[in-house]
Amino acid sequence: MEQNDFDAIQEAAMSEVEPYVPILQRTEGQPPPNAANGGLSYMSFDRNGDAGTAAAIETALQQIADGEGQAVIDKIESTPPGPIETKWGLGFRRYAECIEYIKDSNIKAPEGGVAIPLRYTIDEQPSYSIVSSNKLWQDPAREAQAKALRKDEKDSVRRSLYFPLVLRDARRIEEYYPDLSPSSPECMDKLGISLTHLESECENFYDAAEVERVYYPEMEKLLLEFFPDAKDALVFNHDVFDKEYEGDRTEDQDKKNPGVNANYANLVHNDLNDNSGRVRCRELLTRNLRNFGREQHYTEAEADAKMSRRFMSINLAKPMQTVRQNPFVLCAWPSFSDQSYITGYRVYDDRVGETTRFTYRPEHEWYWLPGQTPTEVSMLKCYDSVIDGSVSRWSFHSACVDPTAPTDAPCRKNIVVRSFVFF
């Protein structure tokens, strides 16, 4: 049989598989999310195999028409210059304004820490992002819809503000939580963040093939050693961040090449949530979908069995050189475990992904690694299947600008891998 014939048969077989629809689920003690459909996955609204994408776009357009997002922008822009009083606290339009407030208010940080502005959303509605590959953008008949959706997504930054916060040095976690080592699985269970060490043999992190061949196995070995009860670890993709990179940044999914990101995600968020943690795992196991790592070919029954036990999604961030600016910062689970999250929908042609945003709390417990070196790996949990409240479900994170760094400090250059760990 020719390879093309085999691929066609495999694709047809996949298309006949019933879509995986995650049941409604949330952490014990956590309030419902701010989400469409009462938190149900858009997979529940599948039409002829579209995985709910049409329903998601319809809801996005209706939300734009309702005007609540524009009302948030209007409120910000109609407020006189200076701090903006919100129900969460004082927010600031500009980073520099928030820095001045921090100085004037004499906000202090502990040793190894720093007081900084972090950008949070102040829009409590779910958000929608129609990815660039969605066929809507190429349909002339939907030009008006595309224009409205493009403007709404571009305006999302106008629905956020800077808020003052204090970062603690993650290396000093034991000072805040006695007997809790930052380099332990117990730290991940309690806080949703932890640290580890790696001396990688990967020489070129801009070479996607070398990263897959050398770095992915290193990361999987590290995860299995870090979590002694784990039975399997799968690294499934990665991102490279380097604002100053002068080579080819082009992404090529077919060649498992993520490209090189010039921008840092300067908004408090998490990559997954109750639904997408399970959906992403399932599509990797049964369809090998968007997988840059080891191929997976589980049957539905085998995936059911694997996912019936505990599994987690862990991101691991490692610098290529010591970080001087645009550090990666992490928030600990106990400080927001009773807080609703806001769902962000990413609409593809064949699925609707889900991420999360959070509104500000002064009590949010943030950590960083000042001067993070190339052998220091920061770990953050994006999803945990345990929902009884006994362990952290996830952390959230952001990039930020370090006000104490020299003006000529180089931007962060690092690699972030995404993984699932199975117990």
Predicted regions: what is each one?
Residues 2, 11-25, 29-37, 48, ...:
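Non-heme Fe(II) oxygenase catalytic core, chiefly the N-lobe of the double-stranded beta-helix
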Residues 354-423:
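Catalytic core of Fe(II)/2-oxoglutarate
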